[in-house]
Amino acid sequence: MWIRGSLLGFLLTVLASASEPSRSLDDLKVLYVGDRDTARATHFQGFLKENVGKVEFAARNKFKPSDADDFDVVLLDWPQSEATRDEWKSGRSPLGDRDTWNKPTVLLGSAGLNLAVVWKIRGGSG
């Protein structure tokens, strides 16, 4: 429940802070990037379809940054796993290079940690 409220709050913030005139959530176009066939993705799919104007899903391992061109917000769901550790070693981010990514993005689960590793962002925790 907390995740739903936080996500909805973020989406409202994105709308409120956009440089263009504000729009309702009915006009918001959201792209969920993750592992589509998981219970988590199915849960987000139901929630997003009820609350935003347009939602589409993209497989994280096949996603190209240009796939997000027609969307207002990207939700990246990138869990930790052995496969993720292999992605860390390859230096591949689903969002491409840090310097070229400019789309408003919500990082779900471990996506923040995973991006920090791949994009070599220094920081800490605690």
Predicted stretch roles:
Residues 66-81, 106:
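Short, well-ordered secondary-structure micro-motifs within conserved domains or adaptor modules
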Residues 2-9:
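Sec-dependent signal peptide recognition
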